[in-house]
Swiss-Prot record:
Belongs to the RemA family. It comes from Heliobacterium modesticaldum (strain ATCC 51547 / Ice1). InterPro entries: RemA-like. It comes from the Bacteria. This is Putative regulatory protein Helmi_20580.
């Protein structure tokens, strides 16, 4: 099994296979998800004190805050997947 890791900013890395959603933090429902995760102790703040620009939701119900734009994280995720699929084609 090949573990794919995604850089979410400032040297913080998340397992790509565990990501369920990458969303923007502006909407009220996402703010509610963040607060509920904070209350449950399932919030991981990887912003280094900067503005939250992306909220990453994992399959373990952890909520990760990132200072990187959601589009950037999604691009890194899709780039990793295309590289991985390219490796399979050559095997």
């Amino acid at each position: 099994m090949d573990i794919k890791l995604i850089n979410i900013g400032f040297g913080n890395i998340v397992s790509a296979s565990r990501i369920v959603a990458i969303v923007s933090p502006e909407s009220a429902p996402i703010k509610r998800i963040i607060q509920e995760a904070r209350d449950r102790g399932m919030l991981i703040d990887a912003t280094y004190g900067r503005r939250t620009r992306a909220v990453i939701i994992t399959d373990s119900d952890h909520v990760i805050l990132s200072a990187v734009q959601p589009e950037t994280v999604a691009h890194r995720l899709s780039a990793k997947e295309s590289v991985h699929h390219g490796d399979e084609a050559t095997e």
